[in-house]
């Protein structure tokens, strides 16, 4: 009788373990939620009178902006979109994708995540961006229109796939409504050296 009881218990445990394993095997993973990071300021080693602001989709402009901020001992501010761009959004070769639609719409102003804050302490503001369809991405327009650049020297810079800076800087200056003393910017390679950046900045 005792032996039969042990056999029944073993059978019960085996069935229980099998059921448990089946439940785990069919459990569906929840899709990851894509969230926006707030735009954040990184303080440089200088006197906090110069600020490098940038938007980067692929990382090229980010690399350049970080080298520039370190070289010029400037504070660094990355513009993060409230709605992050996906790979599909950035498919420039497909009509109807987000980036294509935004760039074709002169009134498009994508929201920036987080609070930009007050720029009063800065005398010089460098604004970096990739070139999209010969212009700065519309989120950079959002930034220019949402801050007070009065009395500041404003210097645009960019990375591109070969199209050059074009009139992208002038287009940004136009939406600033006369605020800021805009200098002519230039295109850089993402791998620009500190020496190249310093030589350029010293001539501004």
Map each language-model feature to its residues.
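Short Gly/Pro-enriched loop/turn and capping motifs at secondary-structure junctions
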Residues: 131-134, 149, 160-164
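Positively charged n-region of N-terminal signal peptides that target proteins for export
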Residues: 1-4
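Short, glycine-/small-residue-rich phosphate/pyrophosphate-handling segment
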Residues: 153-188
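N-terminal beta1-alpha1-beta2 submodule of the flavodoxin-like/Rossmannoid cofactor-binding fold
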Residues: 21-123, 127, 134-136, 178, ...
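Short, conserved loop/helix-junction motifs that constitute active-site signature segments
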Residues: 119-120, 145-151, 175-177
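Typically the conserved alpha-helix immediately C-terminal to a functionally engaged Cys/Sec
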Residues: 139-145
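C-terminal motif of bacterial Sec signal peptides marking the signal peptidase cleavage site
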Residues: 15-19
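Sec-dependent N-terminal signal peptides
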Residues: 6-13
């Amino acid at each position: 009788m005792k032996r039969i009881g042990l056999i029944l218990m073993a059978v019960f445990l085996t069935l229980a373990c099998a059921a448990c394993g089946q439940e785990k095997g069919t459990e569906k993973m929840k899709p990851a939620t894509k969230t926006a990071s707030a735009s954040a300021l990184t303080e440089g080693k200088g006197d906090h009178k110069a600020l490098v602001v940038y938007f980067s989709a692929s990382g090229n402009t980010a690399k350049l902006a970080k080298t520039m901020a370190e070289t010029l001992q400037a504070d660094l501010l990355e513009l993060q979109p409230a709605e992050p761009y996906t790979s599909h959004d950035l498919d420039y070769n497909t009509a109807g994708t987000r980036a294509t639609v935004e760039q074709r719409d002169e009134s498009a102003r994508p929201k920036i995540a987080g609070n930009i804050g007050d720029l009063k302490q800065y005398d010089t503001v460098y604004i970096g961006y990739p070139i999209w369809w010969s212009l700065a991405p519309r989120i950079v327009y959002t930034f220019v229109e949402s801050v007070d650049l009065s009395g500041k020297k404003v210097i645009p810079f960019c990375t591109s796939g070969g199209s050059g800076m074009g009139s992208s800087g002038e287009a940004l200056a136009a939406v600033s409504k006369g605020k800021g003393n805009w200098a002519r910017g230039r295109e850089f390679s993402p791998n620009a050296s500190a020496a190249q950046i310093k030589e350029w900045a010293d001539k501004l």
